[in-house]
């Protein structure tokens, strides 16, 4: 299940992120890559333990809590501290096909998570750079993603994916992983579809409609059945 979620950050927030990031020191992006990924990763990132990365990461986490769609789709248990990368055309930056590590550990907090879902939050407008397309492969084919600044994409971390070479301008983004309460991707997708249908019924019939109440109960019982907390 690949889901694009709009307006996690508004334009003013994006501009402030970019102002802070443009003034920061960057390092080789391979410092956080696994063995296979490091062979195909060519980009830069903010040092993960830097004050700048940690402060911006906290702002991303706060923004996520304001998005009911993100919570519904991800059902997050643990979210890895957000990281930040930069692909510059002047350096021929790209990221070849790879799959993310199954487990990620944070050196500073000691947090270890199973990476159920990968997230990219775009911080550059699509017209500001050429290339830099996130391409994700899943059961249904290949999906190309290039979203407006402030929007994010959520997709299974088990997916093969790549970022095409940036040939003009600079692509800046936040990226991170999360462990969902619901491990199984198919179960999580069904729960999301059910929640979407329930919310539509609430809008039409009201929250106290008997059938809406019954379906809401089914939603929570499925969470109870599948969730690991």
From Swiss-Prot:
Residue ranges annotated for the Fe2OG dioxygenase domain, each copy included: 78-180
Protein name: PKHD-type hydroxylase OCAR_6723/OCA5_c13470
Any matching Pfam family: PKHD_C
Enzyme Commission designation: 1.14.11.-
GO MF entry, a single one: iron ion binding
InterPro entries assigned: Oxoglu/Fe-dep_dioxygenase_dom, PKHD_C, PKHD_hydroxylase, Pro_4_hyd_alph, Pro_4_hyd_alph_FE2OG_OXY
One BP annotation, GO: DNA damage response
Positions annotated to bind Fe cation: 98, 100, 161
Alphabetical UniProt keywords: Dioxygenase, Iron, Metal-binding, Oxidoreductase, Vitamin C
HAMAP family xrefs: Hydroxyl_YbiX
PROSITE patterns per UniProt: FE2OG_OXY (PS51471)
């Amino acid at each position: 299940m690949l889901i694009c979620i709009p307006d996690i950050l508004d334009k003013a927030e994006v501009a402030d992120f970019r102002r802070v990031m443009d003034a920061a020191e960057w390092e080789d992006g391979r410092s956080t890559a696994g063995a296979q990924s490091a062979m195909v990763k060519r980009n830069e990132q903010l040092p993960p333990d830097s004050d700048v990365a940690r402060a911006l990461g906290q702002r991303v986490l706060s923004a996520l809590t304001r998005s009911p769609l993100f919570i519904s789709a991800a059902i997050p248990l643990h979210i890895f501290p957000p990281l930040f990368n930069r692909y510059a055309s002047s350096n021929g930056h790209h990221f070849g096909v790879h799959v993310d590590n199954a487990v990620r550990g944070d050196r500073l907090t000691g947090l270890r998570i199973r990476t159920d879902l990968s997230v990219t939050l775009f911080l550059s407008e699509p017209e500001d750079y050429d290339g830099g397309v996130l391409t994700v492969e899943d059961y249904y084919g290949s999906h190309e993603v290039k979203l407006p600044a402030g929007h994010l994409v959520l997709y299974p971390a088990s997916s093969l994916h790549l970022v095409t070479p940036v040939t003009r301008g600079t692509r800046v983004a936040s990226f991170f992983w999360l462990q969902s309460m619901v491990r199984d991707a198919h179960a999580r997708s069904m729960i999301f579809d059910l929640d979407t249908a329930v919310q539509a019924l609430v809008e039409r019939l009201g929250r106290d409609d008997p059938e809406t109440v019954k379906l809401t109960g089914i939603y929570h019982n499925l969470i109870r059945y599948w969730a690991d907390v």
